[in-house]
């Protein structure tokens, strides 16, 4: 909830911001752009939707992985909770590796690699073999795929939109991230309760598809 308050505060601050600009120490000017101004920037809406989808994937997978393994693989609850840490290990290892990979690959390339890896992990969950080891590998892949997306989106924002607009755009990106983080895990819970936990990989694939489409 505190994270959500910060996200709403970002949006409120952007809505209140007027025109003009502030000069940085190196002489560069940072434009003060309101929320509507950010949304009018070409490509900004797509990158915001992409950020929302990424955070929806990360948080939904992290919070529902154990329930999925209990419901689909028959895993004991305490073991499933332990296995959920594998997803976070995937993100951690991926972020460490990204520090080296970004020296060779561009931000767009890293985002594409991450998106494809998430998709591969979600597809593995659809294999009609209820095997805890297979699910563990699938969630590791989802975690590895998540690793480069968030930092590479942030890092590429000045390149895509210019340093003068990047501060405002990153603020709105954070707000969309908080909304995706808060909204989608409980919403998936409602969906799973009305249907079955087996829809988790399908939900992940839908968000991956949106994320890929918005990036391209």
Predicted regions and their residues:
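A late C-terminal transmembrane helix in Major Facilitator Superfamily
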Residues: 160-197
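Helix-to-loop junctions at the C-terminal end of transmembrane segments
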Residues: 94-107, 192
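C-terminal membrane-cytosol helix-exit motif in multi-pass small-molecule transporters
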Residues: 2-25, 214-215
């Amino acid at each position: 909830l505190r994270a959500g308050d910060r996200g709403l505060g970002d949006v409120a601050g952007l809505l209140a911001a007027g025109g003009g600009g502030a000069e940085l120490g190196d002489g560069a000017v940072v434009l003060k752009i309101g929320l509507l101004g950010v949304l009018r920037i070409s490509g900004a809406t797509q990158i915001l939707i992409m950020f929302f989808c990424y955070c929806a994937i990360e948080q939904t997978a992290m919070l529902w992985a154990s329930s999925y393994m209990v419901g689909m693989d028959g895993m004991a609850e305490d073991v499933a909770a332990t296995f959920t840490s594998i997803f976070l290990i995937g993100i951690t290892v991926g972020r460490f590796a990204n520090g080296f990979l970004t020296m060779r690959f561009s931000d767009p390339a890293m985002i594409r690699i991450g998106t494809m890896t998430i998709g591969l992990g979600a597809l593995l969950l659809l294999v009609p073999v209820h095997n805890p080891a297979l699910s563990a590998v699938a969630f590791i892949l989802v975690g590895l795929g998540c690793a480069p997306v968030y930092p590479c989106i942030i890092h590429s924002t000045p390149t895509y939109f210019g340093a003068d607009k990047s501060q405002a755009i990153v603020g709105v990106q954070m707000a969309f991230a908080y909304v995706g983080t808060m909204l989608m895990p409980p919403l998936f819970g409602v969906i799973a309760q009305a249907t079955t936990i087996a829809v988790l990989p399908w939900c992940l694939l839908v968000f991956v598809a949106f994320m890929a489409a918005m990036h391209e």
